[in-house]
């Protein structure tokens, strides 16, 4: 009996302690709940609704609708397309200008090159023309002077050697002599200073070259002075006219 009373007392004590613990927890829980609610009010952000009443289109994170984004992209694409078209037009214009400038420069280069060649040729021509009379004198001396003695032959050979050097130098510069004998008279190449009546050659044939002409390259450096064939006059009518008074 004594043991049973002890167990009953022990159980009642445990129940009493449990009741006290529950009361203590109940007395403390309202304050903790209030503190937790206030903390939630301070720290938790206000949630943004994902759907707007009256609008069935969902919004993106930045607040723009998909339709607005598509319209903005379309406008940006149209602007970029216009810029590309404008740049292409400018590129075509610049390309055309470049080609025109390049063509003008090429024409200028060719023109200046041609002018330079013409100037060089003119300077060369004027210089050689001053030397041709010396060549003429050498040729006259060779045709007219006939050395008789050994000393004269030595002198003849010496100046003929100078003449040969001069002619060789002119050849290297592109000078070549004309050979008009037997050809038809050409006013672009020849200068007629004499006419000789003859029936052995057609009229206008070059019979003799009196002063040698020269080419410089494919151009005339100096015209040849020539003697040209002319038709021979018929003297029979004149003789008949002279004899007719005597017969009368």
UniProtKB/Swiss-Prot annotation:
Q: Name one GO molecular function term.
A: adenyl-nucleotide exchange factor activity
Predominant location category? cytoplasm
Q: Biased composition, Polar residues: where in the chain?
A: 238-248
> One Pfam family of this protein, by short name?
GrpE
Cellular localization per UniProt: Cytoplasm
Q: Which PANTHER family match?
A: GRPE PROTEIN, GRPE PROTEIN HOMOLOG, MITOCHONDRIAL
The protein's name is Protein GrpE
